[in-house]
Amino acid sequence: MAELATIARPYAEALFRVAEGGDISAWSTLVQELAQVAQLPEVLSVASSPKVSRTQVAELLLAALKSPLASGAQAKNFVQMLVDNHRIALLPEIAVQFEALKNAREGAADVQIVSAFPLEGAQLAELVTSLERKFKRKLKPAVEVDSSLIGGVRVTVGDEVLDTSVRARLAGMQAALTA
C-alpha cells in the first residue's frame, strides 16, 4: 500500500494548500465524503465503464455529496482531475493523508483507544486528558472495545503504542518465565 500512499500524497498536499485558503474542516468533510462514495462498488463500476463519460462520472461523484463545498469550482476541478487521471480509487488514501496534514497543522493526532470495557463520558475525558499530557498534543479519540484484553487499555497514537492491558502484562510474564 506504500505505492498508493506515494501516488496519493501530491493530491492530498495540493488539496490541503487549496483548503488553507478557506475552511480546512469543511474541506476535510468533503474529502471524507468523497472517500466514502468512491469506495462504493457501484461508483467504481460506473467510473470504469466506457459508456459513461468522465464528465458524467465527476458529476455523479459531486451529486452524491452533502458538503456545501461540492458545488464550488475548486471541488469540481479536483474531482474532474481525479476522474481524468483515473485516480478515483485513491480517494480513501487521499482522505487519510489530508487528515494527517490537518492534524499536523493543528498540532493534533488521532488516537485509537482499545479498552476491555466501554469508556464513556468523564472516564474517557479523564483518560484523553492524561494521554494529551503524555503525548504533548491534542488527541482525537476513537474508542473500541475488545474483551480479550481482560482489563486495561491499549492506546495507539501514530506509530506509538502504549499497552497497559492485562493481556499484555500476562504475555510479558509468560515471556519472562519461559526465557
UniProtKB/Swiss-Prot annotation:
Q: How does it assemble?
A: F-type ATPases have 2 components, F(1) - the catalytic core - and F(0) - the membrane proton channel. F(1) has five subunits: alpha(3), beta(3), gamma(1), delta(1), epsilon(1). F(0) has three main subunits: a(1), b(2) and c(10-14). The alpha and beta chains form an alternating ring which encloses part of the gamma chain. F(1) is attached to F(0) by a central stalk formed by the gamma and epsilon chains, while a peripheral stalk is formed by the delta and b chains.
What gene makes this protein?
A: atpH
Q: Which organism is it from?
A: Burkholderia mallei (strain ATCC 23344)
Q: Name one GO cellular component term.
A: plasma membrane
Q: What is this protein called?
A: ATP synthase subunit delta
Annotated SUPFAM superfamilies:
N-terminal domain of the delta subunit of the F1F0-ATP synthase
For this chain, one GO molecular function annotation is: proton-transporting ATP synthase activity, rotational mechanism
Which UniProt keywords are present, listed alphabetically? ATP synthesis, Cell inner membrane, Cell membrane, CF(1), Hydrogen ion transport, Ion transport, Membrane, Transport
- Subcellular location(s) per record: Cell inner membrane
Q: Which domain of life is it from?
A: Bacteria
Membrane topology per record: Peripheral membrane protein
Task: Specify whether Zinc is a keyword of the entry.
Answer: no
Q: What does this protein do?
A: F(1)F(0) ATP synthase produces ATP from ADP in the presence of a proton or sodium gradient. F-type ATPases consist of two structural domains, F(1) containing the extramembraneous catalytic core and F(0) containing the membrane proton channel, linked together by a central stalk and a peripheral stalk. During catalysis, ATP synthesis in the catalytic domain of F(1) is coupled via a rotary mechanism of the central stalk subunits to proton translocation. This protein is part of the stalk that links CF(0) to CF(1). It either transmits conformational changes from CF(0) to CF(1) or is implicated in proton conduction.
Q: Which family does it belong to?
A: Belongs to the ATPase delta chain family.
Task: Work out whether the entry's keyword set contains Transport.
Answer: yes
